Amino acid sequence: TWGDTPKECYEATIRIISRAMDWLNEKTAGKAVFGGAKSSALDTGARREIATKLMPVVRGLIGADEKKAGHFDDSQAVLEFVCSNRLEELAGLGTSCPDHFLRTKIRPLVVDFDPAKPDIDATIAGLAQAVNDYRDGYAAYYEACKHPDSPAMRDPNAVVYLVPGVGMITFAKDKATARISG
């Protein structure tokens, strides 16, 4: 077992996680993360301005059946991922654990945005199609995997929207869930 008491279980969990983190840090020291940088992050003001323009548009596209709260994250870890060479490839792999699967669907939606040539109007113009394509993909996934006793398909909209050079936008039924989903 992990321990005879809740405290021993907690301490064992922390010990194992710390060992895993030490191992990972040792193996990745000095190496480019996510295939290195493909683009640079925009400055803080530009990131916030773009997120401020994108969020109400996305919310309008996905919130017809259920109101959504949004959250924007442009932390260093998020920017490292959304600016990386392997963003599309790794995002396409989908979630990494069952909890993520339940909260974030099978994968995020990578927004078509080029931080080297930021054209927010073109990005917004393409969002409806991107959202519809995501919904269609989710519905096809559900149909391929469902069983006779499966629950009805959940909301087919993406929860996580990754914007190169900008950050991550998440939407859920409330602010706390939107924040946790990232």
Regions found by a protein language model. Give the residues of each.
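Catalytic palm active-site di-aspartate
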Residues: 1
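Domain-length cofactor-binding catalytic modules of enzymes
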Residues: 7, 11-182
